[in-house]
Amino acid sequence: MGAIQAIRGTRDILPPETNYWQWVEAIAKSILDRALYQEIRTPIFEQTSLFERGIGEATDVVGKEMYSFTDRGDRPITLRPEGTAGVVRAYIEQNLQAAGGVQRLWYTGPMFRYERPQAGRQRQFHQLGVEVLGSADPRADVEVIALGTDILKALGLSNLSLALNSVGNGGDRQRYREALIAYLTPFKAELDPDSQDRLERNPLRILDSKAKRTQEIVQDAPSILDHLGVDSQRHFDQVQQLLTNLGIAYQLTPTLVRGLDYYTHTAFEIQSSDLGAQATVCGGGRYDGLVAELGGPVTPAVGWAMGLERLIILLQQMATPPAPSPDLYLISKGEKAEPQALILAQKLRNQGLAVALDLSASAFGKQFKRADKSGAIACLVLGDGEIATGTVQLKWLADKAQETLQLQDLMGNITELKQRLAGHREKYPHLTSNFSVTCHDPMDNLV
């Protein structure tokens, strides 16, 4: 029998690529922690009706892309295609609104859509997202945009642009929907097949069609920005002013509607041209009606999601993330030394040191070569001779200095050892890489 392989549209994420994932997650968590966002973890599968009601049955996600099945209890189940609906379900079910005030939440994890696999787009993919529930204030819209920008800049992305639009409220969209259908109907035969199908069901989705002729037709279509009511226009004006106050540039993009039906008012995408073409790395907007649609109280909300696969591809083109490296590399050889080396490694790890234990049982020379390549600051050498005398050899890998220490003294002076390791790390910074987070402060742009 042949070897079992991963299912099409899924992939294994292996070292050293996992360093990029850990880097992104560490930087995002650091920035979101400072803004007092709290992590939420929701189930990977939910009732199918959650997404049918929340995302919209007329969307491509619900109509074509969901992984749905009936379980052994004859219940319709769907692997989550996005994160917001599950967060909102948890917000309602767990009565989070009872705490009062605004809930600031973030999440990360796998999502599932049946799409044609390609670079940066898999059937199992990962998102990082934030949600602010309980605030209709335009400052919430701009806060999440600023956080998304800060995360991307902290990761080293510089060629970023913000596409911004408003899709208004329900009344605004109904008026615009009628105007758009009236404009597009005479061109129906020239539209691509998907857009012809959407003309009556979901005409706003035609605006982001990738078909060339459809794009040409849409260029002269009515703009939703000309159909905003007074309240919607006021909200959008305030969002734009707040972005300007923070020094965050944006481009008005009236054709930006996003792919999910729950959006209201602000819609946005943060795009990068670092790969030579515009690629959306973060997208979101306001969804003031979703909580009520799913059975909760009327609750304004706004959020975004980042596609991590696409983001990782960008980062791999640009920089090498910091990789974990040991403080100490522990070498051992001998019938008595090897078991004691494991005990010593665990004791040192329990004192907060990063210790790599060589498990090869090969000759000392080969183990020394691996120690040199490991990025460790120093090497501990333990043989049967050292066991007999209660000692250990400490070899500094940068300057090759070597000393003999009593094992008892080594364990009794961990603070001194850490200080010496820190001194060598500072003197020879090439030996180790540590996570560091630099965050663009939008307030720097204020006079």
UniProtKB/Swiss-Prot annotation:
Reactions catalysed, semicolon-separated, are:
tRNA(His) + L-histidine + ATP = L-histidyl-tRNA(His) + AMP + diphosphate + H(+)
Disulfide-linked positions: none
Q: Name one GO biological process term.
A: histidyl-tRNA aminoacylation
| Keywords attached to this entry | Aminoacyl-tRNA synthetase, ATP-binding, Cytoplasm, Ligase, Nucleotide-binding, Protein biosynthesis
What are the record's GO terms for cellular component? Answer: cytoplasm
| GO molecular function annotations of the record | ATP binding; histidine-tRNA ligase activity
- Which InterPro entries does the UniProt record give? aa-tRNA-synth_II, aa-tRNA-synth_II/BPL/LPL, Anticodon-bd, Anticodon-bd_dom_sf, His-tRNA-ligase, HisRS-like_core, HisRS/HisZ, HisRS_anticodon
Q: Which CDD domains match?
A: HisRS-like_core, HisRS_anticodon
Q: Which Pfam families match?
A: HGTP_anticodon, tRNA-synt_His
SUPFAM superfamilies from the xrefs? Class II aaRS ABD-related (SSF52954), Class II aaRS and biotin synthetases (SSF55681)
State its Enzyme Commission number(s): 6.1.1.21
Localisation: Cytoplasm
Q: Give the quaternary structure.
A: Homodimer.
Q: Which family, according to the similarity comment? A: Belongs to the class-II aminoacyl-tRNA synthetase family.
The protein's name in its UniProt record? Histidine--tRNA ligase
- Upper lineage ranks? Bacteria, Bacillati, Cyanobacteriota, Cyanophyceae, Synechococcales
Identify the gene encoding this protein: hisS
